[in-house]
């Protein structure tokens, strides 16, 4: 491989919305926030979970709510 052309591969912190914190290796170079992880994802836990989409729904209703009313 050529020297000094590849991005740095370093350890970062990935924090999930459930509070789970993981140390992973990435070329991103900064800490990341996750919506779901293996500790809270329904596939792994076997439980159903509601995802918070209130902001998007409210924005949609605000834009197009008047069109549905006659």
Swiss-Prot record:
Instruction: Give the UniProt record's GO annotations in the biological process aspect.
Output: translation
Q: Per the UniProt entry, what species is this protein from, by scientific name?
A: Alteromonas mediterranea (strain DSM 17117 / CIP 110805 / LMG 28347 / Deep ecotype)
Q: How does it assemble?
A: Part of the 50S ribosomal subunit.
Cofactor(s) recorded for this entry are: Zn(2+)
**Is RNA-binding among this UniProt entry's keywords?**
yes
Q: Which GO terms label this protein's molecular function in UniProt?
A: metal ion binding; rRNA binding; structural constituent of ribosome
Alphabetically ordered keywords of this record:
Metal-binding, Ribonucleoprotein, Ribosomal protein, RNA-binding, rRNA-binding, Zinc
**InterPro entries noted in UniProt:** Ribosomal_bL28/bL31-like_sf, Ribosomal_bL31, Ribosomal_bL31_A, Ribosomal_bL31_sf
Q: Name one GO cellular component term.
A: ribonucleoprotein complex
Q: What is this protein called?
A: Large ribosomal subunit protein bL31
**PANTHER family this protein is in?**
50S RIBOSOMAL PROTEIN L31, CHLOROPLASTIC, LARGE RIBOSOMAL SUBUNIT PROTEIN BL31A
Detail which positions bind Zn(2+): 16, 18, 37, 40
Q: How is the cofactor bound?
A: Binds 1 zinc ion per subunit.
| Highest taxon listed in the record's lineage | Bacteria
Q: Which Gene3D superfamilies match?
A: Ribosomal protein L31 (4.10.830.30)
- Protein family per UniProt: Belongs to the bacterial ribosomal protein bL31 family. Type A subfamily.
- What is known about what this protein does? Binds the 23S rRNA.
